Amino acid sequence: MFDKKTVSIEWGGKTLTLETGQIARQADGAVLATYGETVVLCAVTAARSVKEGQDFFPLTVHYQEKFSAAGRIPGGFFKREGRATEKETLTSRLIDRPVRPLFPEGFYNEINVIAQVLSYDGETEPDIVAMIAASAALTISGLPFMGPIGAARVGFTNDGEYVLNPSVVDALGEDGNLDLVVAATQDAVMMVESEAKELTEEQMLGAVMFAHEESRKVIGAIIDLAEQAAKDPWELDPVEDKSAALEKLRGVIGDDLAKAYKITNKAQRQDAVNAARTKAREHYSDLEESDPAEYMGRLKLVKKLESDIVRKAILKDGQRIDGRKTDEVRPIEAMVGLLPRTHGSALFTRGETQAICTTTLGTKDSEQMIDGLEGLSYSNFMLHYNFPPYSVGEVGRFGFTSRRETGHGKLAFRALRPVLPDNEEFPYTIRVLSDITESNGSSSMATVCGGSLSMMDAGVPLKRPVSGIAMGLILEGDDFTVLSDILGDEDHLGDMDFKVAGSEEGITSLQMDIKVAGITQEIMTKALEQAKAGRAHILGKMTEALGSSRGEVSKHAPRIETMQIDKSKIRDVIGTGGKVIREIVAETGAKVDIDDEGVIKISSSNADEIEAARKWIEGIVEEAEVGKIYNGKVVNIVDFGAFVNFMGGKDGLVHVSEMKNERVEKPTDVVSEGQEVKVKVLEIDQRGKVRLSMRVVDQETGEELEDTRPPREPRGDRGPRSGGGDRRGGRGGPRRGGGGGGGGGRDRGGRDGGNDGGGEAHVPDFLKD
């Protein structure tokens, strides 16, 4: 029934298996990839015809993680997978970026690539497996895919060794310094995505080359599978030679476009380019009705002519669109503290690209909860990137987070996270928000620069400031030019988008997307060297605005004080069912968080509230000291005295005889529940029971008073007791309405009465004879 084909290789200490022919057989191409015990199914389907009027390549990639893959049931009301998570969106982009350039120009059939994680072993990251499965499925589908590609994750240990396919946790753990993902063909690197702990250019380039070498093994396995199971290739219309038509078009609008691309102002340049395009449409208007296909074909050549004019000007004359040198960075203006009520803010402007970045500091309960295959986890650092349509002078959808915004935000996140302080040093939740207000290239790197400044303005003690730059490439044969700080048009018309961010110590993030084959190690080395000089220049401009983090957090930010208690005291601070900790929060107004190690974080924007909560907690965990005076509150009144809460979480008994020096008939004559009193600790018995006294403390000042009560005389042999000799019968007599018998002949001082028939069974042990 099944014509199953399988290829397996040993790779990175595990077996990688690619299977086809058993599952999803109606798709154009379907591959089940297994690595370790992580299994990903990728299915590829394509439309057989192009939609009318289609003038772009509609490739859509969907990556989905099934909770069942990790033996979990999704949360929420519906208990099923919902909209794509951030990780799923980023992995979809990770697959899309190296695959898209490998389809021929002019191929506009719609393609769906769907990758689903079916099993996850908790160690093998499924994103790499999904990239390999997608490449294999496209390769055997018969589509005009100029692959295959391989993919690999690389780590870099403290010992200076590269590691193939570490888990994400290990890659950036205590012994890890790098999380780098590479996608490549047999001959060239196509895509790089990474986060690093301030590594050098040489170390980063070495990791890329290591990943490329390892990915070739995967490419070999995919080719072996294709030799067994590949479908017949699609028949494509022969590519028409349009060089003659291009030269005719150059004669119509070539001069207009050349002049337009020398205008430095983006809006004015765009107007001039649009005027040239309109001129082309008018020139070929006679074809619009007689030969619509030819008419559309001629108009598509306008974009190719634009690219040709810009690229030749850069390669031959070294002339960029805005007149800069190839290694020149646009003018930079940076300022901080522009928004009065935010915790930190910065405005970063580079040419016609601008970002307003704000930093907000929160407490532990503001951490982001992430529910994925690995289970619940929490992140105390967030970076959100917004790209409103007005930033490019357009009308468009607002308020919806696009895949591009998610990807750009994550790139800036990776660039800044390595320089954040440890949570023990700075126990805040940090949210950086970047709103792009103008855009003409490299807005994600403006977010890195602005985000770094806004965090320093908020008082976040960064290890070092971080700057970022976007590099470009124009490649024609063996001739190439690397461009620093590219414009939007240079990005669209060029061959590479190469973003580098880092501190003065090294690179923290590297992202590369290549649109053509032939990017050599020499080109990447040149780009990294040029980027290093550009980053240093930008960092200098940032330092002029703010050289280092402010000494303290904003006055509008919450204060967080950390204290450590013994683990055995945690339950005392929390109380039964959380009663004590809730009372602390309710009474003081401060937030209190406590972890399993006994680390307590107290937060509030009011220093007095923090101090009140701290003292309360100290009172709970502190041991009572005999002879010391404390503030307390009456929490319960009984016949023989009152229980007083002191030191926040301790109760002690003030016997009726210790309320005043003179005789007290009833405790309620002296105190009432909720009353604030001052007490002295007289005794703590072996069971921790505390005996307190009010009579030796001035209730106004809290000062200790001299004990004027004469000492009690020795009682000697007390003999038989009248009036109900059985002590359990009670001896209250008529003096306290106790209903017991006699005993009235003895003056027993403060121990008289008050048991209401209960006898000494109600008296604490340390008060009994």
UniProtKB/Swiss-Prot annotation:
Cofactor requirements of the protein: Mg(2+)
Disulphide bridges: none
Residue numbers binding Mg(2+): 491, 497
Reactions performed catalytically: RNA(n+1) + phosphate = RNA(n) + a ribonucleoside 5'-diphosphate
EC number: 2.7.7.8
Sequence ranges of Basic and acidic residues compositional bias: 707-729, 745-754
Region described as Disordered: 698-769
InterPro entries for the chain: ExoRNase_PH_dom1, ExoRNase_PH_dom2, ExoRNase_PH_dom2_sf, KH_dom, KH_dom_type_1, KH_dom_type_1_sf, NA-bd_OB-fold, PNPase
GO biological process, one term: RNA processing
Localization (cell): Cytoplasm
Top-level taxon: Bacteria
Molecular-function GO terms, alphabetical: 3'-5'-RNA exonuclease activity; magnesium ion binding; polyribonucleotide nucleotidyltransferase activity; RNA binding
KH domain segment(s): 558-617
Cellular component, GO, one term: cytosol
Task performed by this protein: Involved in mRNA degradation. Catalyzes the phosphorolysis of single-stranded polyribonucleotides processively in the 3'- to 5'-direction.
Record family assignment: Belongs to the polyribonucleotide nucleotidyltransferase family.
HAMAP family: PNPase
The protein's name in its UniProt record: Polyribonucleotide nucleotidyltransferase
Organism: Erythrobacter litoralis (strain HTCC2594)
